Each structure stands twice: as structure tokens, then as C-alpha cells.
């Protein structure tokens, strides 16, 4: 058999727990999976995607009280590392959905940091939202996540604002996975 040939002729040890014969789309190898379009192509395996999302979720817990700068630094480190490792694979759609989800979570964190309705209204007005809309959002009874997906927060805490460094250049902006992947 093949195992005898590998062990006797080549002098290699075969690990039976790791060795298997299967179709490429059933295989996970170093975090990568494979799928067949017209030919087999490389993608991040589903388990790798779930692990990445779980790590992002851990860094964007709203109960964790760390500064936004430190949070962005950790997120940038994680996103760059993951995208660099899986760069050879096709993952544009996955990264687009991750970026949308991450922006919503960041908006929730910022909304919670502003705490008081008065502060929220003032900060929304600073971001260019008119007074009526800002007041309506600030005094809303909706939950954090529902408010993070509204027009007021989506346009005031936009992708452009999140990725832009602050005025003192102490904080670099947030790196978005899809932009980094396509660059």
C-alpha cells in the first residue's frame, strides 16, 4: 500500500490521525480550504473564518473599557496579520461582510462611550447631523445595535471617519480588511 511505500522506501513516519484521502473541498490544510469553481481554488476554511470573527468580537466587546486608540491598534494588528496570511485565497465577499459587521460594532462602542443623550446629540451635531435628527437619535429608546445601524450613526461615524487618523496623529485610523486585501 501507499503507507508501506512511504514508511519503508522513503523512510518517513505517517501520522494516521492527520493522514486521510478525500476530495479537496473536504480538506482543511493550514487554515485553508478549497472549493471548485472551474478549477479548485483556495479560500480560508470555515473554521478559520469563525476563529477570526471570534477574535474580532473579543476585541470589540462593549463592556471592555479600553481607549479607542488602543482598540484600533489591536484590531489593526489582527486584521493585517489575518489578511496577510490568507492573501493568496479568494475572500472578497467574506471581508466585505466582516467590515460591515465590524463598523457596526465600533459604532456601538462609540455610542456607549458618549453615555448621556446630551453628549450624544452634541457629538452627532459635530459630525454634521442636523439638530433634529441628532436629538431624535440621542433620545431614542432603541438599543445600541439598532441605533448603530441607523442613518444618523451610519453617516456620522462613517467608514471614512473611522479609517482617518485623528488630528494629533496619535491614533492611526482603523484598517478595514477588504481595503487592505485589495491594496
Residue ranges and their predicted role:
Residues 1-183:
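Non-catalytic terminal/accessory segments
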Amino acid at each position: 500500500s501507499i503507507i508501506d511505500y512511504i514508511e519503508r522506501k522513503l523512510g518517513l513516519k505517517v501520522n494516521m490521525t492527520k493522514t486521510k484521502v478525500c476530495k479537496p473541498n473536504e480538506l482543511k490544510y493550514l487554515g485553508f480550504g478549497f472549493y471548485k469553481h472551474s478549477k479548485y481554488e483556495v479560500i480560508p476554511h470555515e473554521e478559520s473564518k469563525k476563529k477570526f470573527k471570534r477574535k474580532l468580537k473579543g476585541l470589540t466587546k462593549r463592556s471592555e473599557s479600553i481607549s479607542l486608540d488602543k482598540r484600533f491598534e489591536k484590531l489593526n494588528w489582527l486584521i493585517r496579520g489575518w489578511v496577510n496570511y490568507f492573501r493568496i485565497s479568494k475572500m472578497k465577499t467574506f471581508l466585505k461582510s466582516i467590515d460591515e459587521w465590524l463598523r457596526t460594532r465600533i459604532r456601538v462602542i462609540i455610542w456607549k462611550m458618549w453615555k448621556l443623550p446630551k453628549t450624544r446629540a452634541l457629538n452627532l451635531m459635530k459630525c454634521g447631523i442636523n439638530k433634529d435628527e441628532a436629538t431624535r437619535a440621542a433620545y431614542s429608546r432603541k438599543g445600541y445595535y439598532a441605533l448603530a445601524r441607523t442613518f444618523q450613526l451610519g453617516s456620522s461615524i462613517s467608514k471614512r471617519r473611522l479609517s482617518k487618523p485623528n488630528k494629533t496623529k496619535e491614533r492611526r485610523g482603523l484598517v478595514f480588511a477588504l481595503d487592505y486585501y485589495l491594496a
